[in-house]
UniProtKB/Swiss-Prot annotation:
Zn(2+) 2 binds at residues 163, 166, 185, 188. This is Chaperone protein DnaJ. One of its GO terms (biological process) is response to heat. Belongs to the DnaJ family. It comes from Bordetella avium (strain 197N). The keyword Protease does not apply. The keyword Zinc-finger applies. It comes from the Bacteria. Zn(2+) 1 binds at residues 146, 149, 199, 202. The lineage of its organism: Bacteria, Pseudomonadati, Pseudomonadota, Betaproteobacteria, Burkholderiales.
Amino acid sequence: MAKRDYYEVLGVAKDAADDELKKAYRKLAMKYHPDRNPGNKEAEEKFKEAKEAYEVLGDEQKRAAYDRYGHAGVDPNSAGGAGMGGGFADAFGDIFGEIFGAGRRGGGGGPQVYRGADLKYALEITLEQAANGFETEIRVPSWENCDTCHGSGAKPGTTPKTCRTCGGSGAVRMQQGFFSVQQTCPTCHGSGKEITDPCTSCDGVGRTRRNKTLQVKIPAGIDDGMRIRSAGNGEPGVNGGPPGDLYVEIHIKQHRIFQRDGDDLHCELTIPFTTAALGGELQVPTLGGKAEISIPEGTQSGKTFRLRGKGIRGVRAGYPGDLYCHIVVETPVRLSDEQKNILRQFEASLNDGGDRHSPQSKSWTDRVKEFFS
């Protein structure tokens, strides 16, 4: 399983100050400490993950290496992004190469190449924007190649020297029993170069923190939590490696009228008790404008009316969802004396046929009597 980004583990931005890192780590350590979660394997793993992240980001040199090369820059067992397959092949390749005189397989002849880190960006949008789709401009914090040294990390006019530890290959070979294992060079972190006169603009890192502006197209029907991938718009690769990708995660603001459920929409429709009793025509809001529904006589609270096709056309759906209007019958307040007298007269007129006029009330009364009998 791939390791999570250390900044993501601690829940901080990539330009977080030391005190922010420490505060975030202490919070996680307190929450997931094994003494507070005895027998909880998941909490134990999260505690170890937070500890590992802080050990790297809390150290200035390790953090600089991590910012430039990712996990490979701080993992002595990394094989420059080749994965388990590459390390296994190199180990056996050396053995058979020594026996049969074959050449070494893999990328040991030059600096280690790393893919750029992926970036995440949370974008908050309205329900209307999600339904209709739109194009917007975003500013994404990212590490970019330094304009002064063009990513070399060396002061202009100087040249990085070949790493003395690995001879410029970016990797060293360690003998482990019968096997010769290739590892990322601990001195140059895979670059194959040593910087003796660092660039003053980036302190020798080769990268600077900045915001880059991008245009992002949000498709119609997108839902909360979905991600849009923008290929190649992540952080730049190292030593000619490919750039990472940008993932824009969508968060939809709460709407004052509608609640979304997949491609369907729900809303509460409050009506006066007179309309509920007598029926009538009502206008209801939809994302596309207004629609009319007929309220039949004797409508009760909780009744649901379905308007077909008035929901949202999802990203993968060929047709739109529906709109469900849930009726809430409103009881009048602050009545005048005259209005109260009218209602009392109305109440008295129901005494002879209460069961007929209020069947649900009669049913409820019968159930209560049965409960206490």
